[in-house]
Regions:
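Bacterial N-terminal signal peptides that target proteins for export
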Residues: 1-11
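Sec-dependent N-terminal signal peptides
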Residues: 12-18
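C-terminal motif of bacterial Sec signal peptides marking the signal peptidase cleavage site
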Residues: 20-23
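Aromatic sugar-binding interfaces of carbohydrate-active proteins
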Residues: 25, 340-356, 363
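Short, low-hydrophobicity acidic/polar segments
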Residues: 28-237, 300, 316, 323-325, ...
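Surface-exposed loop/edge segments in extracytoplasmic proteins
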Residues: 92-102, 250-258, 332-345
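Short helix-loop boundary/capping segments
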Residues: 197-204, 212, 217-308, 318-319
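Extended, compositionally biased non-globular segments
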Residues: 297-350
Length: 392
């Protein structure tokens, strides 16, 4: 695969958490205090909403912040959740210090061991998930640590092509301890895209990390419901929902490597810190991914939309195939038909305006309705084996 040109997201959304971070020996052990405790906040760009051919885009709703603060212009704070951020503290001419920021949803910790204060350049990615590794250099040459002040190249290996996780890279960092006021609104001066400089200082409570992230994947939001008249006759229980992507008729491979070139700027203009991204397929297995995510139990669909999110590698993708597996019951609870399977092919430029291929940082919303082909002249087979149709 070749290069994917970077795109500038239309809007920005924030991910904000403020929790004490202490260094520890590993992700699985209790944290032990290091000489330089760290506290973390982060924001991530909002998805650009793909405009449907027949109606306007919706705004993305964010969850509330856990503390009052004045966000950078154009950003909105959301909750911390469960995240693991792969991080590299770098200095020109030095080996990078690699570690993680990780949260269980209520507190943050770090594996970074920072014993000497100083000026660093902070790079990273999220989420760090099982089986994924990452290396860094200051140029395309491996093991080049000469000029992190100018940017970096992250190579994130073995990423799933379709995943429940929002895959992002760090595009800006700052030490903001001068801006923080406990239990009060505060602003973050100088937090800018393309500025990776971060100062580690001595003194308890002074290392507050502010991080900016940007998406390198696209997002797919699927809304499913049952036709109202049909819902009076049958109950639909959704068991599986998964997506497969393809580019120019070639199905995307299951795993890939992402090489992301970042350039440092002073943040004074609209230059995108993501210079380019190369996605390289790994292995020969064709990919598909479950959209249902962490839901282990089947879902009874109703006439109200059930919503599911997934993320996928966007390079060259012009078609998505959604497959749903469900059981059909009568209104007495008797199983009528098991493991019905329906596949729907989404041709991008037929459903979304002026888009022949998916773009990173863009979210695509698809509405699906389960209904029989001819509701008012039903054969028994049609009643018990309904189709799934796009209703965008």
């Amino acid at each position: 695969m070749g290069l994917m040109e970077p795109m500038r997201p239309m809007g920005l959304i924030g991910l904000m958490s403020l929790i004490g971070l202490m260094g520890c020996t590993s992700e699985d052990t209790e944290p032990t205090e290091k000489l330089t405790p760290i506290e973390l906040m982060g924001v991530v760009t909002q998805y650009e909403e793909a405009t449907e051919a027949t109606r306007a885009a919706r705004a993305y709703e964010a969850n509330g912040a856990t503390r009052a603060w004045t966000t950078p212009s154009g950003y909105t704070a959301i909750g911390a959740g469960n995240h693991t951020i792969g991080a590299f503290l770098t200095q020109n001419g030095q080996e990078p210090n690699e570690g993680f920021f990780y949260s269980n949803g209520s507190s943050w910790h770090t594996t970074l061991d920072i014993e000497t204060p100083g000026n660093f350049y902070l790079y990273g990615y999220m989420p760090h998930i099982s089986g994924v590794t990452c290396t860094i250099s200051s140029s395309a040459a491996a093991n080049d640590n000469s000029s992190y002040s100018s940017g970096a190249v992250l190579t994130i290996r073995n990423l799933p092509a379709v995943t429940a996780n929002d895959v992002c890279v760090l595009v800006g960092a700052k030490n903001g301890w001068n801006d923080y006021k406990d239990n009060a609104d505060y602003s973050i001066t100088g937090l800018r895209r393309g500025d990776f400089a971060y100062e580690v200082v001595t003194g308890e409570g002074k290392n507050k990390v502010f991080l900016l992230f940007d998406h390198i994947y696209s997002a797919l939001r699927v809304r499913m419901k049952v036709d109202g008249d049909y819902n009076n006759l049958r109950t639909i229980v959704l068991k599986e929902l998964y997506v497969q992507t393809s580019a120019s008729g070639i199905v995307t491979k299951k795993r890939l490597d992402a090489t992301v070139t970042l350039r440092a700027t002073d943040g004074s203009d609209d230059t995108d810190p993501i210079s380019n991204i190369v996605f390289t397929p790994v292995g020969t297995d064709e990919g598909d991914g479950t959209i249902l995510g962490a839901l282990n139990d089947p879902v009874t669909l109703t006439t109200v939309d059930s919503e599911y999110m997934s993320h996928f590698m966007p390079q060259g993708v012009d078609k998505l195939i959604l497959t749903s597996v469900y059981n059909v019951y009568d209104k007495k609870g008797n199983l009528v038909r098991e493991n019905c399977k329906a596949s729907n092919t989404l041709i991008l430029n037929q459903l979304f305006s002026e888009q022949d291929q998916t773009r990173r940082g863009c979210r695509y919303t698809v509405n699906l309705t389960i209904m029989p082909t001819y509701l008012y002249s039903l054969s028994e087979a049609d009643l018990d084996n309904p189709t799934v149709t796009f209703t965008n």
